[in-house]
Amino acid sequence: MGYLKRLVLYIVIMVMSVFIIGCDKSSDTAENPKEGSKEAQIKKSFSKTLDMYPIKNLENLYDKEGYRDGEFKKGDKGTWTISTDFAKSNKQGEMNSEGMVLHFNRNTRTATGYYTVRTTYDEVDKLAREKKYRVEFKNNKIVLLDKVEDENLKQKIENFKFFGQYADFKDLKNYKNGRISSNENVPYYEAEYKRNNSDGNVKKLREKYPITTKQSPILKLHIDGDIKGSSVGYKQIEYTFSKEKDDETFMSDFLNFGPSHSK
C-alpha cells in the first residue's frame, strides 16, 4: 500500500514538473522569439537595411550593394530608393502629408526625386490636392529644381532630413512582445511593437514633427514580398502616434534596393 502511494506521488510530481517546464518554455518563446520564427525572420530581413541607419552621408548609397535577383539586367548596379513621409489630420475630414523620395542610381551616380505636399479628404467625391517639387541630391545637399515662392516651404525642402539619416535601430533584436501577422499567399509579413516616448527614435520624431498627442506610438515593420528578399516587393516602417479620427498622426519610411530600369 505504501509503495502504491509513493508511486502515485512520484507520477504526480513528474506530471507537474513537465507542466511547469512547458509553461516556462512558452513564456521564453513569447519574450524571446526562437531563431526561425516569423518574428525573428522579419527582424532579420529588416536588419539588412536598418543596420545602415543612421546614414550620415546619403551619397554613400552609391557604393552600397543590395539584394539582387533575376529582375536585374546584366550590368545594372541597381538603385537605392529612400523615402520619408509625415501625415497628420489638422482639420476635420482632412489629412495633410509632406515628404520626400530620392532615387540613388548607382550606374550614373545621380540622385533625383520629389518633395510632395498632399491633402486628402474623407469625402469620396472630393479630389485630393497634390503638389510635387523636383529635387536632386548633390554634394550631400538637397537642391531644388523647381521654383518655390513660399520661402518657408523652400527652406523646409532644402533642409529636409530623411528618417534614415538620424534613426538608430541597433537594438532591434531586443524588441519584444511583437504582434505578428502574415499571409504567405500574398505574401506579406508584419510585426508591431509598442514603443515608449522615451525611445530615442520616438524622441527625434517628436522634435522634428508637430506631434501633439502624448500617446506612445506603435512601430510597424511591414514586408510586401518574399521575406528572404525580393526586388519586386518592398519593406516599410511606420510609427503610428494616433488613429483617432481627425487626429491621425503617423510617419512612414522606407529604404529599398531595386533594378534601375524600374525607377
From Swiss-Prot:
Signal peptide: 1-22
Keywords assigned by UniProt, alphabetized: Cell membrane, Lipoprotein, Membrane, Palmitate, Signal
Entry superkingdom: Bacteria
Membrane topology type: Lipid-anchor
Localization terms from the record: Cell membrane
Family statement: Belongs to the staphylococcal tandem lipoprotein family.
Annotated InterPro entries: Csa, Csa_sf
GO cellular component: plasma membrane
Pfam families xrefs: DUF576
Name this protein carries in UniProt: Uncharacterized lipoprotein SA0402
Residue positions bearing lipid (S-diacylglycerol cysteine): 23
Organism: Staphylococcus aureus (strain N315)
Principal location: membrane
Lipidation (N-palmitoyl cysteine): 23
